[in-house]
Amino acid sequence: MYKTLKTIYKKSKIITSIILIIFTLQTKILFAQNNSNNIDTSDLKEIINLVEKNKLNKAIQIANKNNSVDLINLINWIYIFTENEIEIEELIKMYEKFEDWPKANLIKVLIEKKIGWESNNISHYQFINENKPVSALGNIKLANYNFKSIDMKQIIINNWINNSFSKNDEKFIMSNYKNLFDNNIKYKRLDYLIWNKKWSSAYRQLKEINSDYSNLYKARIKLSRKEYGVDAAIKKVPEYLINDEGLTYERVKWRRHAKLSSSLDMLSNYLGKNEKLKYKEKWWTEIIIHTRKLLKEKKYLEAYNLLSNHKQTNTYNLSRAEWLLGWIALTHLSKPKEAQKHFSNLEKIVNMPISVARANYWLAITEKELDNNALANEYFEKAAVHNSTYYGLLAEQAIKKEGSINFINLQSKNIIYEKNESIFYSLRLLARANEKKYSAKFINGLFQQNISEQDIINILKIFEEEKRPDLLVKACKKAVRLNIKFQNCLFPYPNNIKINEATQYIDTALIFAIIKQESEFYTGAISRAGARGLMQIMPFTAKITAKSLNIKYDKDKILSDAEYNIKIGSKYFSQLYQEFDNSIILSIAGYNAGPANVRKWLKIYGDPRNEEISYINWIESIPFSETRNYVQRVIENYVIYQKVILNNRINSLKSINEIINNG
């Protein structure tokens, strides 16, 4: 009884708090002047902290003190993303208020979860009738409410197959609509659940199928989860199901992890069949890992043949496959005509500056190999248009052309509101709070909406004014996908970062180049691996480097003191630079992947310092996709930060050719 009363009391407090927020918001709109520009950073941080802890009354008190409508809006918006319990009626009010805000669909998802299966409240079902459901659960609940037509039955079936649900929701769906789900539908759903590692739902679904298919799916689960008894489980799978796509995929992956060479044979044989892959993207990981392994073993034709059967259709994987096929054909098989086909295919399907420059650069190299110099120059010209990218810069040097970069001058732009201006005021407050979590959600949500060029300029200008180069870079990366001219906004000058002593180890432009790629200039960055701060230093590396500097090691300071972080990171890079005989490229690779990996790659792929291999091909030989991308991005960052942003403070600029040719 006590617990029930306590729960009711807690819920009533939450409802009261939300009503108070909404009431305060309405009165502020009527009577308050906007005061967002004067809000203190410490107040913003405290408000976010209070909202996360469900202390709404205290958060409102601070908002009232600041007399800001936007702050009240922001409290409401952040509250949606906390794990605090919100009643359905309040969620509906919130959706009505924030329908045009970033991530508003999350409110709909929460509402759809809370609507009862047998709710007597017609208004709840009217809401999802009028506001198209965004979740599978919402679609099934709406179909359940309107369950009269064949269409509604099909909606239930389609959403059931390709989604997972809570145990209680599954129980209701199964008890009411089991007659809709024949064996084929049950198999399809279990197939989906295992591919997507939804184990709890998969185990429940296993109880609904016959023994043959049960044995198949049990074997797949054991393989995927690396459980004991894999061989015995596979033996129980009947012969007519042994070539199931999901089972073959899991067997290939399991054998690769076990370092068994038979994984390649199984993969090649399955891809060689004329069968469509249902989960092409999942297969891509296995294909590319095995291809790179074959390249490492210098089995170039075998690598080419395996990759030729990739069967990828999404643009990202298809472009990666076409590029690598072209590169293998050109550099390892001496088949420029074959390479030409692949690079042409690549050029037709890409539109992002980095990829367009890459495709045209390699087309140019291929045409040179075929003695088509005039055509090669045309492709170099096309690549050089994108001269803030790695291959664009290389193309520019190849034709001895140095074009200017048309940076967008945000200072000359005006903020003009084409949509709810409160959204932009709230974005400014988040930027000022010097936090990343909610800012990132806000940015992602904005770019998922129908966003105009002026909206993008507003966003970027706000981040520039609030001295948040990290958020500016994040937003620019999104903006480039909508309009490639924003590529030239990707290199902000970080006025809020002090370099000072670090320049005695490496130059300022290189420091900025590394920081931009490591943390995007966010001082509070912590990676999943534990790397910390602007230069993303691992604590163990920082400890050793601090000792070499004769300074005290302080783990907390790596994160809290940007200058300390940069000093240690720069010193560590300079040590790599010495180890690799003043090779910038090898040092960059070592900074990302560790010097031990670089030493290993030099033995496997050749040493560009001894001209055993060109630096360009050595970089493309790196087996880690993250490191390949990292090296290219840091090099382009380095050139741009020298060439444009730091031009007045550098006596001589290193071109990309100098960096590449001298390592």
Predicted regions and their residues:
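Residue at a conserved register position within TPR or TPR-like alpha-solenoid repeats
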Residues: 50, 115, 146, 193, ...
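TPR repeat positional signature
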Residues: 43, 76, 108, 139, ...
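Structural register within alpha-helical repeat arrays
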Residues: 46, 74-79, 111, 142, ...
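Bacterial N-terminal signal peptides that target proteins for export
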Residues: 3-16
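Catalytic glycan-binding domains that act on GlcNAc-containing polysaccharides
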Residues: 70-73, 77-79, 89-97, 235, ...
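N-terminal leader/linker segments that initiate helical-solenoid repeat arrays
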Residues: 30-78, 85, 405-424, 432
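Structural motif corresponding to the intra-repeat A-B loop/turn of tetratricopeptide repeats
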Residues: 53, 118, 149, 196, ...
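Solenoid-like repeat scaffolds
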Residues: 35-36, 60-69, 81-84, 93-101, ...
